[in-house]
Amino acid sequence: MSDLNFRAVIIIPCRKHARPLALELPKILASGLGVIIVDDGNTVEESQILNSLLAPNVMVLRHTGAPGKGAAMQFGFEYAYSQGFTHVIQIDADGQQDAQAIPEILVLAMRHQNQLICAVPNYNKVPLGRFMARYITHFWVAVELGRCQIIDSMCGLRCYPLAQTLQVMHQH
């Protein structure tokens, strides 16, 4: 695939994080990419906040039933693919990822168009409870994998090549 065929969009799965997303969205939009927010079964109040974020380059897709982040991402991936996008940059709605890293992720994705690109979060701004929850998750993932050096088992900023990702998703 040449750079001329490379088309990326940002997908943000959102459940119970509409307020932090509203604060982070201007930083995310600074990347210059369009944004698809996947409303993953939010309350009416949270959905109203998401609706207030609509703009020419921001859309909200409703994913009913709140089946979880993975299903919300697949829903968003399939929509993006149907719109001709080749890559999706996924960033979590909770504001823990550095949106200013999106251009760097984009450059890497353009160089390595068939590879999944994962960022590393900055844990300095994370509340203690969330830090501990991540640490416990990392610990058990390391135990399961037999490895101790896991930087982020729950990476919230990635770039997916859509065709390959959807092919794997449809096999399972």
Question: PLM features: residue spans?
Answer:
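Cell-envelope/extracellular polymer assembly enzymes that use nucleotide-activated donors
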Residues: R7-V9, G34
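Short hydrophobic beta-strand elements that form part
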Residues: V9-P13, R62
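Short, well-formed alpha-helical segments that are part of the catalytic scaffolds
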Residues: K16-A30
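Donor nucleotide-sugar binding loop of glycosyltransferases
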Residues: H17-P20, N42, K69
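Short beta-strand/loop segment that forms part of the nucleotide-sugar
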Residues: L25, L33-N42, L61-H63
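A conserved acidic beta->alpha catalytic loop
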Residues: D39-Q48, G95
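Acceptor/aglycone-binding surface of glycosyltransferases and processive sugar-polymer synthases
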Residues: T64-Y79, A99-H172
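Short beta-strand-to-loop acidic/aromatic patch adjacent to the donor-nucleotide binding site
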Residues: F85-Q96
